[in-house]
């Protein structure tokens, strides 16, 4: 699929417009047997172990409105999602985005615009059935008081399912295992990871998973300094605020 990036920059940047540049879910590509889909992931320690208490129905964070990006620390950002029953997310420059994983990991139901338009092999490992169910719950309850018994029962059960799925399938270690399994390297005990010094979500997250799995037997060349606690650089500039 060819997308003219200059043309895309000249037109209104909305999910619906961008979607038109992507493959329809009804026309999915059949990839060669040695090409596999992949997704982002999230460190297991970032995933809540229980459903958090909710204080409001919808998060004030709007993905396409940077004036709502008001949080300067990870804790403040995560607490916004923990306090919210639903959080808005959508396709922007691409389908995959850390926000989807951060929502699920913090016990916030993604209200995912146009998720039904996502191609089968894109965000392949995400629980699209649960995401569609989350949209249905939003439409069912968005005008309901946050203390409503039926709302809490049904939505909290759904959040538990999202947390369980994220912990089982979407951790950095789980995706690292997926890469090793698909490339027939499940039995290796040492890794040489050749990447880039610059932060990149997919590359860095896979490296994190391999580091968790192999420890000092995973060597990154060049060294990705931003993932190490011993480094003291300003990491506040490496995320997409």
Kindly give the residue locations of the regions a language model identified:
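Catalytic core of nucleotide-activated saccharide and alditol-phosphate transferases
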Residues: 1-65, 143-155, 160-186, 195
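Catalytic binding pocket for nucleotide-activated donors in carbohydrate/polymer assembly enzymes
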Residues: 69, 73-197, 201-214, 218-239
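Contiguous N-terminal and early-domain "leader" segments and peripheral loops that mark the onset or edge
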Residues: 25-27, 32-50, 212, 216, ...
